[in-house]
Amino acid sequence: MKRTKQINHASFRKSWSARHLTPVALAVSAVFMLAACEQADETVSMYQNADDCSAANPGKSEQCTTAFNSAKEEAAKTAPKYASRADCVAEFGEGQCQQAPAQAGVGNTNAESQSSGSFWMPLMAGYMMGRLMGGGMGGQQQPLFSSKSPTSPANGKFVDASGKNYGAATPGRTMTVPKSALAPKPATTSTVTRGGFGESVAKQNTMQRNSSSTGSANRSMGG
C-alpha cells in the first residue's frame, strides 16, 4: 500500500491546536473571569452601632465593637468638616452635628477655627461592614452619614464621606457593593461650604444613575 508522501503539516498542526488548546484557553479565560467577579463585589451589612451588629451576629460582640470604634475613628478623619455649626446643621439637620475632635484631619485653612477647635462635622449615622464567605465577618468597615434636612440629597440616605449613596438609612440590611466602597477615604484637609457636601452627593447620584443605565443597556444588547 502506498503511503501519501505529501502531508499538509500546517493543516495538521492547526487542527491539533484547535482540538487541544481551545478548551484549555476557554477554561483559563473562565477562571480569570470568575476571579474578576469575585474581586469586584463585596456583601456588606449596615449597622447603626455595635449593639445592632452584636444582635445580628451572636458571639461576635468583640469584633462588632472593634469595627464600630474603627469606623468612628475613620469618620473623625474623613467626614466633611464645616467652619461653623450653622453650616453643618443646614446640611445635616438639627441634632446631627458635633464638634470635630482636635487633629481630625483638617488643615490650617482657617486659623481662627483651628485655634479654637470649632470645626464641625456630622454625627456618624451608621457604618457598613464587610462579610466573609460562610457568614464570617470581614475586617473592613466604612463610616456612613445621613441628613435630616429635607433639602439635602442625603436626606434619609446612608452616604459615605465621598458622598456616595447606599440607599435608605435603615440599619440591619445587607447589600452588594464594589470592594472599593470599603477602601479608606482620604482624610479631610479643608472645610466645605454650606451645601457643598450635598452637591457632592447629587453628583454621585447622577454618576450612579448613569452607570446603572449603561449597565442595563449593555445587558439588553447581550454585552
From Swiss-Prot:
Region (Disordered) spans which residues? 166-223
**InterPro entries according to UniProt:** Biofilm_formation_YgiB
List where Polar residues composition bias occurs: 202-223
Q: Which family does it belong to?
A: Belongs to the UPF0441 family.
HAMAP family from the UniProt entry = UPF0441
Q: What is this protein called?
A: UPF0441 protein ETA_04310
**Which species is listed as the source?**
Erwinia tasmaniensis (strain DSM 17950 / CFBP 7177 / CIP 109463 / NCPPB 4357 / Et1/99)
